[in-house]
Design a protein with these regions (language model features):
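Catalytic histidine neighborhood in serine/cysteine hydrolases
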Residues: 232-251
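Acidic catalytic loop of the alpha/beta-hydrolase fold
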Residues: 219-223, 249-250
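Hydrolase active-site cap/lid region
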Residues: 154-210, 243, 251-253, 257
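Short beta-strand/loop motif that positions the catalytic acidic residue
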Residues: 208-209, 214-216, 220
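An N-terminal hydrophobic leader/cap segment in hydrolases
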Residues: 8, 12-55
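Membrane-embedded segments
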Residues: 57-134
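Alpha/beta-hydrolase fold nucleophile elbow
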Residues: 140-151
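Short alpha-helix in the alpha/beta-hydrolase fold that links the catalytic acid
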Residues: 92, 201, 210, 224-233
Length: 271
């Protein structure tokens, strides 16, 4: 009986180790969905732009676009989600242009024309390089930069905002942490899963002093609405919550009548 019990215990731990090893190796493909092909550019959307070339760690080349607006006071530093690349963010770029913002959007390492490999560390580093480009190359004042992050880009935005004094922070359809997502998806078994990534926004958000606008939809089928609410509740700075309607990737367009005015009002409320 004792031998049987020991065999069951050993089998359980071997199985758990095997599952974790498999998931650990698979996690990059589950978190990052980069596409290399640039399918369109702002010029095809009727917007003039400047191709931006940055360097990560003085070696890895990053690619992005800078769009200026003659009446802009603020600049949107745009961090997109985990799929595609900057060429799939035309709707958002056009909206920000209509709202009279300058826009800098970059592709993380491994996305679009950017070199390297996507990782949690390289995403954070890419964000810092983009920030420094605005400050040093475009001579943009920190208080005139609004950091914007959608979905996974929200975690990138929070990390950067916790380290700099931006004018504002907009988080759309994002989450509190990867652990919280796994807890919801796997419930009681989640603590047995070893995670390769943290993206722990809920801890970092407490260090953000800039005003924050959080946008989320109860219809979001990718990032649970409750995680957006949890992140919002953890903010200690001045904050606003906008509830939109629609699915994860389409909600902002389906709620355009409330979405655009809310972003405009938020920007006007900044010092």
């Amino acid at each position: 009986m004792r031998k049987l019990f020991l065999r069951v215990v050993v089998f359980f731990w071997v199985l758990l180790f095997s599952i974790n090893a498999f998931l650990y190796l698979k996690q990059p493909g589950m978190v990052f969905y980069p596409l290399k092909e640039i399918e369109s550019t702002p010029r095809e959307w009727g917007l003039s732009y400047e191709a931006v070339h940055l360097k990560l760690n003085n070696k890895t080349k990053l690619s992005g676009w800078y769009l200026s607006h003659p009446q802009a006071k603020n600049t949107i530093l745009f961090f997109h989600g985990n799929g595609g690349n900057i060429s799939h963010r035309g709707d958002s770029i056009y909206i920000f242009h209509k709202l009279k913002f300058n826009v800098l959007i970059i592709d993380y390492a491994g996305y679009g024309k950017s070199e390297g490999v996507a990782s949690e560390k390289s995403l954070y580093q890419s964000a810092n390089v983009a920030w420094q480009y605005l400050i040093n190359n475009k001579k943009t004042k920190a208080e005139n930069i609004i950091i914007f992050g959608r979905s996974l880009g929200g975690a990138v935005a929070v990390d950067l905002a916790s380290k700099v004094n931006a004018g504002g922070l907009i988080l759309e359809s994002t989450f509190s942490s990867v652990r919280d997502i796994v807890d919801i998806a796997f419930t009681k078994w989640s603590k047995l899963i070893y995670l390769r990534y943290d993206f722990d926004s809920v801890s970092k958000i407490k260090k953000v002093s800039s005003p924050v606008l959080v946008i989320h939809s109860p219809d979001d089928e990718v990032i649970p609405f409750q995680l957006g609410q949890y992140l919002f509740e953890s903010i200690t700075a001045e904050k606003t919550f906008l509830e939109i309607r629609g699915r994860h990737n389409e909600g902002f367009m389906q709620s355009i009548s409330s979405y655009m005015p809310a972003i405009k009002a938020f920007s006007l409320s900044l010092p």
